[in-house]
């Protein structure tokens, strides 16, 4: 029977993963809160102390730092002498290590964090197990991100948990521990930047970096321009998160944490044109994120517009020559890698909230056509584009999109039909291939009726209202194709 050690601070998906391992004939060992969570879910699990024959001590500071753990992880199965030594010491082989670390970055991001709190959230046993297992990836599977749980289970079932895949996991581990160590260094070194002011001039502010990853705003390489402001940083992060979702060439324009124009195309110049045309007024003074290299042709276009920030994976030398003639524009070079394990937090009085970033997607085949009329291919393309954009728009959010761009955005209204009115009234075009996209279900049929009055023929929304049928009936009445996704995308 294979053995796995599970010790995680982020317990998202761990119970389901553990149950799957049990079905695949794994014996599970765990510690502290992870063990408690598994036991509460009636998952058979043993304490790591049963491996070590040594209790957890010092308030849990020492629990996995033991030869019975690390010998079982580090043993080279291809060396008979390693196996003989394990046998002599009565140490069992460990086949899988599932660990994510104490939330140091989240802890030190609190404005009132003390040094003592930070120290208690420096993980020792976790990184040690991760590094040991990653070093021995030839024989041991190491998982640091919950996003990898499903693929690992599928590969075990299909006998595809091979060395190449374990090497991919190893790389993720060392990237993760490197980032973790950098966060510790940054905190104690005082790696924060005083900003000119906060959201408004009367508010003081600073930028505390807890990561140096090239795919983050904190790790971005600024090529030109004065220091980023508080609002620049927030808007740039919002634009970056959205543009990363697109595999095709894409451009995103953001103002006040909301996209004002999103476009895609066969090349980045066309994508930007579509984003610009989506709302050529609101883009003034905005933040632009692009997922392809900025060329000289695109730079000429950007140079003619007042923009605060331009984000891209790369700028050609010719593009830099053009754009750096503008003194105040800020140019950021950022890796466009998507990190599905990212979390976000919001401070509230007396504490803070933590959640996974809303990077979740619904496959087209898992969406459901609920009306008599099915969407055309162009309507599907319009819906899917809009569905990528909608999580980035403040709720209540209703947007209109075609196959290449957003054409109307209604954000942040207290009722859904109000957002729909804004999107419809501001639309640059409405035709049979424009889809209406809603981040939440329709509590009544009024939004569908309003859409019909404006000529909308395709709608995508989460569904789930007790009055869903009223909206479906209204769509059928006007010959509208409606799709439900089963997943909402509120943003507050």
Curated annotation (Swiss-Prot):
EC number: 2.1.2.3, 3.5.4.10
Cited InterPro entries: AICAR_Tfase_dup_dom_sf, Cytidine_deaminase-like, MGS-like_dom, MGS-like_dom_sf, PurH-like
Disulfide bonds: none
Protein's pathway: Purine metabolism; IMP biosynthesis via de novo pathway; 5-formamido-1-(5-phospho-D-ribosyl)imidazole-4-carboxamide from 5-amino-1-(5-phospho-D-ribosyl)imidazole-4-carboxamide (10-formyl THF route): step 1/1; Purine metabolism; IMP biosynthesis via de novo pathway; IMP from 5-formamido-1-(5-phospho-D-ribosyl)imidazole-4-carboxamide: step 1/1
Entry superkingdom: Bacteria
GO BP: 'de novo' IMP biosynthetic process
Catalytic activity, as annotated: (6R)-10-formyltetrahydrofolate + 5-amino-1-(5-phospho-beta-D-ribosyl)imidazole-4-carboxamide = 5-formamido-1-(5-phospho-D-ribosyl)imidazole-4-carboxamide + (6S)-5,6,7,8-tetrahydrofolate; IMP + H2O = 5-formamido-1-(5-phospho-D-ribosyl)imidazole-4-carboxamide
Keywords: Hydrolase, Multifunctional enzyme, Purine biosynthesis, Transferase
Gene Ontology MF term list: IMP cyclohydrolase activity; phosphoribosylaminoimidazolecarboxamide formyltransferase activity
Pfam families cross-referenced by the UniProt entry: AICARFT_IMPCHas, MGS
UniProt domain MGS-like: residue ranges: 1-144
GO cellular component: cytosol
Similarity comment text for this entry: Belongs to the PurH family.
Swiss-Prot/TrEMBL domain comment: The IMP cyclohydrolase activity resides in the N-terminal region.
UniProt xrefs under HAMAP family: PurH (MF_00139)
Name of protein: Bifunctional purine biosynthesis protein PurH
Species assigned in the record: Staphylococcus haemolyticus (strain JCSC1435)
């Amino acid at each position: 029977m294979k053995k796995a050690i599970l010790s995680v601070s982020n317990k998202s998906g761990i119970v389901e993963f553990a149950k799957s391992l049990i079905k695949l004939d794994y014996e599970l060992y765990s510690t502290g809160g992870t063990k408690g969570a598994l036991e509460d879910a009636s998952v058979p699990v043993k304490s790591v102390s049963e491996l070590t024959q040594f209790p957890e001590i010092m308030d849990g500071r020492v629990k996995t730092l033991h030869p019975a753990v690390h010998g079982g992880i580090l043993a080279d199965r291809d060396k008979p002498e390693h196996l003989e030594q394990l046998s002599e010491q009565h140490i069992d082989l460990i086949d899988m290590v599932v660990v994510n670390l104490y939330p140091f970055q989240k802890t030190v991001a609190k404005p009132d964090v003390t040094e003592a709190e930070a120290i208690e959230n420096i993980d020792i046993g976790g990184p040690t197990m991760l590094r040991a297992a990653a070093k021995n990836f030839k024989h041991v599977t190491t998982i640091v991100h919950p996003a990898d749980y499903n693929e690992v289970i599928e590969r075990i079932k299909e006998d595809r948990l091979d060395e190449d895949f374990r090497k991919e996991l190893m790389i993720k581990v060392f990237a993760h521990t490197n980032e973790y160590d950098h966060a510790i260094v940054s905190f104690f070194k005082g790696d924060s930047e005083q900003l000119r002011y906060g959201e408004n001039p009367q508010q003081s502010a600073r930028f505390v970096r807890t990561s140096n990853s090239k795919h983050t705003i904190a790790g971005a390489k600024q090529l030109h321009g004065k220091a980023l402001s508080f609002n620049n940083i927030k808007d740039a992060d919002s634009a970056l998160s959205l543009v990363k979702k697109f595999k095709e060439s894409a451009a995103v324009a953001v103002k006040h944490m909301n996209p004002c124009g999103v476009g895609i195309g066969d090349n980045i110049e066309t994508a930007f044109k579509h984003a610009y045309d989506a709302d050529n007024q609101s883009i003034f003074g905005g933040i632009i994120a692009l997922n392809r290299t900025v060329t000289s042709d695109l730079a000429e276009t950007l140079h003619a517009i007042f923009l605060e920030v331009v984000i891209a994976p790369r700028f050609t030398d010719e593009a830099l020559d053009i754009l750096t003639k503008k003194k105040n524009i800020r140019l950021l070079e950022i890796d466009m890698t998507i990190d599905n394990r990212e979390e976000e937090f919001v401070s509230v009085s007396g504490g803070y909230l933590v959640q996974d970033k809303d990077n979740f997607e619904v496959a087209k085949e898992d969406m459901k056509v609920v009306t008599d009329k099915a969407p055309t291919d162009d309507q599907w393309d319009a819906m899917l584009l809009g569905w990528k954009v909608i999580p980035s728009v403040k709720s209540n959010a209703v947007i209109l999109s075609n196959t290449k761009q957003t054409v109307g955005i209604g954000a942040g209204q207290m009722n859904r039909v109000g957002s729909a009115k804004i999107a419809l009234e501001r639309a640059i075009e409405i035709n049979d291939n424009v889809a209406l996209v809603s981040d939440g279900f329709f509590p009544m049929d009024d939004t569908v009726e309003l859409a019909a009055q404006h000529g909308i023929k395709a709608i995508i929304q989460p569904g789930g209202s007790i009055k869903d049928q009223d909206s479906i009936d209204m769509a059928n009445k006007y010959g509208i194709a409606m799709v439900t996704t089963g997943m909402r995308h509120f943003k507050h």
